[in-house]
Amino acid sequence: MKALSKLKAEKGIWLVDAPKPEMGHNDLLIKIKKTAICGTDMHIYNWDEWSQKTIPVPMVVGHEYVGEVVDIGQEVRGFKIGDRVSGEGHITCGHCRNCRAGRTHLCRNTSGVGVNREGSFAEYLVIPAFNAFKIPDDISDDLASIFDPFGNAVHTALSFDLVGEDVLITGAGPIGIMAAAVCRHVGARHVVITDVNEYRLELARKMGATRAVNVAQESLKDVMKELGMTEGFDVGLEMSGVPSAFHAMLDTMNHGGKIAMLGIPGGEMAIDWSKVIFKGLVIKGIYGREMFETWYKMASLIQSGLDISPIITHHYKIDDFQKGFDAMGSGQSGKVILSWD
């Protein structure tokens, strides 16, 4: 089968002929229709320090996808051949305390599809049936293929009550932009998103952000005054991993504010903890999606009228995968879809 593999311990990714994956008794075999390129895939492509420590070589990568079930393990129940599915990319152990308590998103032994095991940049993918999610008929393949990052946005955005609240999102990558759309859809008052990438800030405006602020050109505090905000933001969503962005968030949060953090800093990050203490801030770390509450919420949000389609900006056939990675690497894109049909 065709597959995109990390063949060498250097920058790049390669289109190869790989063996079709073997299926176990509790697995599904999925014929991939569409995949999306994630920021994690770009780290692997660029072979940065994290990738060098984490990714086995050679390995098929990728973890954002939609496809069709073409074979079913003999112990599997609840799926049939022909089902259209995406899937949770975190394979959990099932036996740690959090797994046994139903908090599988907090499994301490998680294995990542396309990170620690063979991924979805291929014509076929095998995953445990437990990890598969059936896609409703009224949700397109394009949208289903980005459910993984959309789930990050939904999990982060819905961590705290948003109705009538003022929300600051730092980082206008695709996940931050989708989070802005979610916040507006569920009833936040002002949703302000910050970045220095004007292309992506314009995408955020299209997706419903109240203000998309280029912090290299405009003061966040001036924007707050313009919006009539006198007491700071109620909810903060940190999506960038950039220390200066988090410092700005701490400066502008209201007392009693709540922060959900998805962005991963490049290393240790010092902050002024007195602001956290004296403001009584709550900070929550976010990793992945709640299994599977976030997945049901994603489907429901789209079915209730949330439109995240503008975040998809580029489509390529798999043979043109290099154009897709170039688009992602340029910073002048939203989500990039690769078609395997």
UniProtKB/Swiss-Prot annotation:
Zn(2+) 1 binds at residues 38, 63-64. Its EC number is 1.1.1.103. One of its GO terms (molecular function) is L-threonine 3-dehydrogenase activity. GO terms for cellular component: cytoplasm. It comes from the Bacteria. The record marks 148 as: Important for catalytic activity for the proton relay mechanism but does not participate directly in the coordination of zinc atom. Zn(2+) 2 binds at residues 93, 96, 99, 107. Its main location: cytoplasm. It catalyses: L-threonine + NAD(+) = (2S)-2-amino-3-oxobutanoate + NADH + H(+). It is found in: Cytoplasm. Pathway: Amino-acid degradation; L-threonine degradation via oxydo-reductase pathway; glycine from L-threonine: step 1/2. It holds the Pfam family ADH_N. Its cofactor is Zn(2+). The keyword Zinc applies. NAD(+) binds at residues 175, 195, 200, 262-264, 286-287. GO terms for biological process: L-threonine catabolic process to glycine. Keywords: Cytoplasm, Metal-binding, NAD, Oxidoreductase, Zinc. Binds 2 Zn(2+) ions per subunit. The keyword NAD applies. The active site is at residues 40, 43. InterPro entries: ADH-like_C, ADH-like_N, ADH_Zn_CS, GroES-like_sf, L-Threonine_3-DHase, NAD(P)-bd_dom_sf, PKS_ER, Zn_alcohol_dh. Belongs to the zinc-containing alcohol dehydrogenase family. Homotetramer. Catalyzes the NAD(+)-dependent oxidation of L-threonine to 2-amino-3-ketobutyrate. This is L-threonine 3-dehydrogenase.
